[in-house]
Amino acid sequence: VRNEIRYADLAGRPSRVIAGALATVLGFLMTLMMSPPAQACPICSGTAPKLTLLQKLINADRAVIARPLGGGDFEVLEAIKSSPKEDDRRGTRLRKPKFVPGEDVPTRADAPSVLLLRQSIGGAWVVAGQMPSSAAPAARLLVGGKRSTDMTLADWQARVVTLAPLLEHPVAVLAETAYGEIARSPYAAMRSARDRVKPADLRTWLADPGRAPRRPLYWLLYGINAGPVEARDIAARVDALGRSNGLTDLSSLLAADLEAGGSARRVVLRKRYFEDRSRTLPELQEAVLAFTVHADAGDAALRRDTAAMFGGMVRTHRALGGLVAADLARWQYWEAVPDYIALLRSRALHPVMRQPVLDYLTASGRPDALAAVAASEALRRTGSAAVIPTAALLSGRIP
């Protein structure tokens, strides 16, 4: 086995392991570059369902809780969203409504009641899920919502306040909607859930293997709702991960630790992840994500402090300095320009990190930065290649 890989070789036919590692890094960089402050928190937004009941209600002109009568008819039990032209009073009979092809429509008269939505365009009905009539008040809370793309931070905060009590609601479609909408909200809006979710409930949900996909959000909410006991619990978990180079829920736990532990824990985590050269690439990715989320949700002073810390990472973890380039450019922190110029000239930069660094230097507009970009591009065109150890690349422990 060759003990070295030339950067140029990676553009040819890399092994599956290397290809997977590079794809992971590229995905991480795209997440950072495409997640402006007012948008979804990147720690857990990827786990949210693409289309929640709230979003479906925006596209519906009628929504009713109804029970099947057999023969294709339904009886309205509760109106959730009504059309002025229709009679959706309790007891109204829906005679053989037309459903979207492929819908799982209950036909037996003894089947549970369901929430039916009629689409504004086309007029066909869809089955949103089982729902008892007793859930009507909660379902009505979802009516009148805005599309995510039209929402301000204040809108998101109001949505979190409304939906936090519906987390893990016994009606599955309501629980999924509450989770999905809060998971895709900005972190600054998630803070509106403080004192609206009990830490004891969050501990129960976090301990349930069946809810594992929802843990990233629930760790964030645990930190937001933490008292002294919860803060110590979070810190102990983060410290255990630090000792073992663990990655399980790391970004969400780090963010929770920053929220619950304040400035003292920030100092600890800063030293552990950004000043320790032995940290792996996956650990650094998770730490950058957590600190970025907090910086974007904080004030200018916090962003400045985070930017300075990230600037130091360019010197401490030279090959991976590109991890923070997009954030530094977004925050217009140009003090790292000399370090990035030196990094390009040394050719120690990992090739996957190269483009974000070039983009950062170009965005700075500084003559020395633009000259370095031009020189780097000229060098690349000559086919010159730097060398990195294979073992370092595969382990993630790149100096």
PLM-predicted stretches and their roles:
Residues 36-165, 170, 174, 183:
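Transition segments tied to proteolytic processing and entry into folded domains
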Residues 1-18:
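N-terminal secretory signal peptides that target proteins for export/translocation
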Residues 19-35:
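Bacterial N-terminal signal peptides
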Residues 353-399:
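Eukaryotic acidic, Ser/Thr-rich intrinsically disordered low-complexity regions
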